[in-house]
Amino acid sequence: EEQLYDQQYIDGFTENWDAMKAHLKDFTPEKMAEFCGIDADSLRAVARDFADAKSARMFWGMGVSQHIHGTDNSRCLISLALMCGQVGRPGTGLHPLRGQNNVQGASDAGLIPMFLPDYQSVTDEGVRSAFNEIWQSDNILDQKGLTVTEIMDAVHEGDISAMYILGENPAMSDPDVGHARDALAKLDHLVVQDIFLTETANYADVILPASAWAEKTGTVTNTNRQVQMGRPAIAPPGQAKEDWWITVELAKRLGLNWAYEGPREVFAEMKRSMKSLENITWELSLIHISEPTRRAI
């Protein structure tokens, strides 16, 4: 109603603005005040501050994203930043803060169902061919996998009867906890690999004791893309093992010829397929370094 949007930015860098504008027409501050518990005048004041600022930046965390409609929440914030032109300039941007210490590193390494490492599409034949060669495989599927919530739906639908969960606690963190717990209870077999007897581990048929951060060697990458080395301060207790060791031993028992002797060899393989790590070496581990490096750019 006050035309606070940045028309020049919208025209140059966005699509479907007319449809978005028409969609938002009925969402007045007065109407939204009933839903969010903030009066209309305050909503207008915040909108003016954000839109009129020379530079404005958004940060959000799990309170926004870990909902059954978390993706839509994030898309709304992205659209808001785009329509106000608060993207692509110093002091602007969007920063979805992760919930744990290495979500960025795990995502970089391919723990997203539609991507292989370094956000390379699993549907790209050239990408799959390269990874088939690196991993000595010939059967990487050309279809994206399932998200955590989709996995739980698939269990209820009878498409999944067994799961192997590493370092995750969906019985507590899933947006619909009851739905997730019912799914875990329906499984024929559940393996959980973790450092604690979590709510999810209570549903497990087999528990593999993993090691904590201070008990193992490896790297983590934060949201600022800093790759940092961790080294063990103490040995893992009891029968606990490092995650890479458990994975390799399971692979060997399944008949795979995996010969990794430690995280260093795993990191070397990652560098072969991830240009973001191109100029980062194990020898640089005395310092932290950010990716993508100058050479990778």
Regions found by a protein language model. Name each.
Residues 1-102, 122-286:
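Cofactor-pocket helix-loop regions in the catalytic cores of large enzyme subunits
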Residues 109-110, 126, 295:
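Disordered, low-complexity tails and leader-like regions
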Residues 102, 109-114, 118:
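Surface-exposed loop and adjacent secondary-structure segments within mature catalytic domains
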Residues 287-297:
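Single conserved hydrophobic/aromatic residue that forms the stacking wall/gate
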